[in-house]
Amino acid sequence: MTIAARNRFIRMGALVSLSLVIAASAGVAYMTLKGAHPTGQPGPRGFALLDGFFLTPFSPTAAVLAAGIFPFFSLLCLAYVLFAFEKTQTIEITFFAAAAFSVSLESLRVLVPLGELVPMARISPVFISRAILFCRIFSTLSLLASVIFTTGQTAQQLGASVFLIGFFSFSLVTAVPFNAARLYSNFLVRPGFTATITVFLSVIALLAVISYLIQGKTRAAGDYTAAGFALLAFFAGYAILSYCDSWAFLCAGGFLLFSGGWQYLDRIHRYYLWQ
């Protein structure tokens, strides 16, 4: 994939993310103006112990806002990539841009409560949950690939690699069963084999972080090591916002997601600036 082709795809992704920002903002604003934010808990919480903790009371508004944060994060990341890496061919940034774009699909969660007010926006929660599981698998695998392929993958094969990751993620998601009757407090239907999927994503995320730390030590590059820790913050923020149903989760997850993404891009930019 040439730099020009990569930049075209990133611009398209940025436009889609901008569209999702506008759509999610409009949905949240509509519910706010109508005074129709969800008032009840749509289902059990991801962590039942949170019900008894005074810092994490259930807030449906926080759950809706958490979903709306993701496309804004994606748009900022893609804009940074276009500005700082417009003429730089970097394997890491190509995969990170793909991951950042896929994260914007988390905003589809807004359609679940919005669908109760606007019939045209009503989409099956199972379909939305399946699409979001796809973006979580795809983004995690892309970030692992961003460090693995730097050891030998050529820039011309990046397009095919991203496609294969997308195909694998789609195939995996279609094989996972969903029970439409199990809507949780974050407006998602929990998939079957939840524990297995959680362990799988956690292991892939940790492998990505560890791989960056190893590469940083091997190359004697402090910026690469810092990028690994930034990814750890990104994954932590992503996980927290994925289960977000309280204001404490919204604040903590948002801070980790944005600070991790910013630090990762900044450190990779510094690394290539001195090459």
Q: For each of these PLM feature ranges, what is it?
A:
Residues 87-102, 155-166, 216-229, 248, ...:
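Membrane-interfacial loop-to-transmembrane alpha-helix junctions, especially the N-terminal start
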Residues 6-18, 27-30, 48-71:
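Hydrophobic transmembrane alpha-helical segments in integral membrane proteins
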Residues 75-80, 140-151, 172-182, 194-222, ...:
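Alpha-helical transmembrane segments in multipass membrane proteins, preferentially the mid-helix core
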Residues 19-32, 36, 199-275:
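C-terminal transmembrane-bundle signature of multipass membrane proteins
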